[in-house]
UniProtKB/Swiss-Prot annotation:
Family to which the UniProt record says this protein belongs: Belongs to the sulfotransferase 1 family.
Keyword ATP-binding assigned: no
Pfam families named among the record's database cross-references: Sulfotransfer_1 (PF00685)
Lineage: Eukaryota, Viridiplantae, Streptophyta, Embryophyta, Tracheophyta
Induction remarks: Up-regulated by methyljasmonate, 12 hydroxyjasmonate and 12-oxo-phytodienoic acid, but not by hormones.
Active site positions: H168
GO MF terms held by the record: hydroxyjasmonate sulfotransferase activity
Protein name from the UniProt record: Cytosolic sulfotransferase 15
GO BP, one annotated term: jasmonic acid metabolic process
UniProt cross-references to Gene3D superfamilies, sorted A to Z: P-loop containing nucleotide triphosphate hydrolases
Length: 359
């Protein structure tokens, strides 16, 4: 995939930290102003907008804000606003959507390899395949963490078709930008129990130094109240689930557990949805199996690029790969927590037809 060039939106208004310092100077105070990393580069105008939003304790930053009906960080809101204002979809665009820690890295690797298998043969691949030198997040960039981060407006004109992007946005906040005919959305979700445990581990690994670690019980309470990045998780899942039932040609819904159970069958389904089905000859040559093995959690985790490099917002790639298992939650949740989350899932997802395998 070609690398897009970036240009920043000029900031005519001083940063929030500078505004705050000016206010203190007017009051005759000259001490240094404590400043969190998440406030860097935010304008006074933007900070005023943030101050008007409901907020809760964050997982890896001080706060999460309720924006467009979901919870996210300040810098994410800045990027989302730029994306929604400037992104222009094209026919044949592919958008991969997930809630955090539900198999995003795996989905990116699988989709990239399916779409580019005629350029990079997975059967004959040695170290020349892009996955050996690039993390999947570099091959399929996020709207909110890469392309439009910090309010940037990227030039996407040089990207080869089909352009492939990723997002954690709920469907309601993505819908208007992907309505053009031919744009396809692939959604991957994971059972809420494992998603929670994976999120808790990951956020404590990458949290800001100014934020204390979130304890398991604290995180669990926030999660059950819907306060997690891009949550509530049930609304995120149901948004894509219902759209996939309404428009299966537009939105393809996958479960992490189904991929673990039968990766090859689901790869065939995914390729067909992307209008690049595997031929009989490809199946005889073992292309489907080769893609599954190349993109497997075990293989990706052992690659040097995923051990030492950084991709998303300078977070170390190694934190993206922990266990990749189903039912790891049994090692962490108490009986009362299992009961609470089970009741919540039944209440929020009951009657929708959306169910999960937990073990």
């Amino acid at each position: 995939m070609a690398t897009s060039s970036m240009k920043s939106i000029p900031m005519a208004i001083p940063s929030f930290s500078m505004c705050h310092k000016l206010e203190l100077l007017k009051e005759g105070k000259t001490r240094d102003v404590p400043k969190a990393e998440e406030d860097e580069g935010l304008s006074c105008e933007f900070q005023e907008m943030l101050d008007s939003l409901p907020k809760e304790r964050g997982w890896r930053t001080r706060y999460l804000y309720l924006f467009q009906g979901f919870w996210c960080q300040a810098k994410e809101i800045q990027a989302i606003m730029s994306f929604q204002k400037h992104f222009q979809s094209l026919e044949n665009d592919v958008v991969l959507a997930t809630i955090p820690k539900s198999g995003t890295t795996w989905l990116k690797a699988l989709t990239f390899t399916i779409l580019n298998r005629h350029r990079f043969d997975p059967v004959a691949s040695s170290t020349n395949h892009p996955l050996f030198t690039s993390n999947p997040h570099d091959l399929v960039p996020f709207f909110e963490y890469k392309l439009y981060a910090n309010g940037d407006v990227p030039d996407l004109s040089g990207l080869a078709s089909p352009r492939t992007f990723a997002t954690h946005l709920p469907f309601g906040s993505l819908k208007e930008t992907i309505e053009k005919p031919g744009v396809k959305v692939v959604y991957l979700c994971r059972n809420p129990f494992d998603t929670f445990i994976s999120s808790w581990h990951y956020t404590n690994n990458i949290k800001s130094e100014s934020v204390s670690p979130v304890l398991l019980d604290q995180a669990f309470d926030l999660y059950c109240r819907g306060v997690i990045g891009f949550g509530p998780f049930w609304e995120h899942m149901l948004g894509y689930w219902r759209e996939s039932l309404k428009r299966p040609e537009k939105v393809f819904f996958l479960r992490y557990e189904d991929l673990k159970d039968d990766i090859e069958t689901n790869l065939k389904r995914l390729a067909t949805f992307l209008e690049l089905p595997f031929t009989e000859e490809e199946e005889r040559k073992g292309v489907v199996k080769a893609i599954a093995e190349l993109c497997s959690f075990e293989n990706l985790k052992k690659l040097e690029v995923n051990k030492s490099n950084k991709s998303i917002k300078n977070f170390e790639n190694r934190f993206l790969f922990r266990k990749g298992e189903v039912s790891d939650w049994v090692n962490y949740l108490s009986p009362s927590q299992v009961e609470r989350l089970s009741a919540l899932v039944d209440d929020k997802l009951g009657g929708s037809g959306l169910t999960f395998r937990l073990s």
